[in-house]
Amino acid sequence: MRLKDKLGGKVTIISMGPMQTREAIKKAMSFGADRAILLSDRHFGGSDSLATAYILSTALKKVNETEPIDLVLAGKEAIDGDTAQTGPGIAQRLGFPQLTYVIRVREMTESNITVERKTEAGRQVVEAQLPALITVEKELNEVRYASLPDLMKAAQYIPDIWDSNSLIFDATQMGLKGSPTSVSRIFAPLG
């Protein structure tokens, strides 16, 4: 939202999940987003990171038809899989450069973005042309507080709901059919 405050533009939230995800979307809307889209369908269920990247990138392509995208922000990794593959998968499908593990946006112009990212050796400053996708770490920014009017407005907000009939999807690339990986078991490491 701070990038929007500084540079203008619109913020669209796109999330994939069950209908209960609307509550999380409402919270995000209270911080100043302009629009939200929830991708929700039983056919999306069981999607691994590859299938999830396919579904999200298909939605982003549709948004890009009417509202050109400059920057896609994604979380570093999902809490259920910890694979950190969905953001890079989306970038690859969109043909966008990707900057991962971003902890700070140093500068953004109409054509470029410069960020600071975490690496195993420390920190690195990198630049990419826009449009781009960045996966962000928690320390990227402090969450702003929503004002009471924004909270009240967001509580009434109804996101657009897109299902498998809303876009042209290849059924073999989503859900369990489109997921080459599966979890056979989960266990805590010894020690």
Regions found by a protein language model. Give the residues of each.
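N-terminal glycine-rich FAD/FM-binding segment characteristic of electron-transfer flavoproteins
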Residues: 1-191
